[in-house]
Amino acid sequence: MAARMDPGIGGDVTLLHTSQLDNLINLARASSLYYLTFGLACCGIELMQTGGPRADVMRFGAIPRASPRQADFMIVAGTLTYKMAERARLLYDQMPEPKYVISMGSCSNCGGLFQLGYSVCKGVDKVIPVDVYVPGCPPRPEALTEGLLRLQEIVRSEPWSTKRRPAAQAEGA
């Protein structure tokens, strides 16, 4: 970085030169992530709090979207049953590349308290690829914010043209 005086502005101007276009594109992508919510149980209530004033994720550039075709990543929160796994996979497949998934809470990470149930999927990663796991039952909104920051690090570090693996078949589906 170099600082110089610009007589037209009347102050120090910091010039930043990026040698790779990928770095600039990834910085822009990481700072404007659109997300799709998939709240299924009590973690969905905590997910709603992330849009509130206390844990406002919009200050990090994360904006909710209603359509998977406009979303960069999906937040799966709560107990995923085999019937809902089909819908989660469908929503994931409708998202444009590159796409990411945050698994929020013990139930979506590994089945949680209900993992012995016959209809409960033993983790979202059995259905779709997961990039960030947020632990807790239910996790606090601050934990989801930390997961979002981790996802931004992942987006910044990988090439922007990276292709993701397709969604897997659900167990028992």
Swiss-Prot record:
Family (UniProt): Belongs to the complex I 20 kDa subunit family.
Subcellular location: Cell inner membrane
Hydrolase is among the record's keywords: no
Lineage, opening ranks: Bacteria, Pseudomonadati, Myxococcota, Myxococcia, Myxococcales
Cofactor note: Binds 1 [4Fe-4S] cluster.
Any one GO biological process: aerobic respiration
Record key words, sorted: 4Fe-4S, Cell inner membrane, Cell membrane, Iron, Iron-sulfur, Membrane, Metal-binding, NAD, Quinone, Translocase, Transport, Ubiquinone
Species this protein is from: Anaeromyxobacter sp. (strain K)
Function noted in UniProt: NDH-1 shuttles electrons from NADH, via FMN and iron-sulfur (Fe-S) centers, to quinones in the respiratory chain. The immediate electron acceptor for the enzyme in this species is believed to be ubiquinone. Couples the redox reaction to proton translocation (for every two electrons transferred, four hydrogen ions are translocated across the cytoplasmic membrane), and thus conserves the redox energy in a proton gradient.
Protein name (Swiss-Prot/TrEMBL): NADH-quinone oxidoreductase subunit B 1
Catalytic activity: a quinone + NADH + 5 H(+)(in) = a quinol + NAD(+) + 4 H(+)(out)
Pfam families: Oxidored_q6
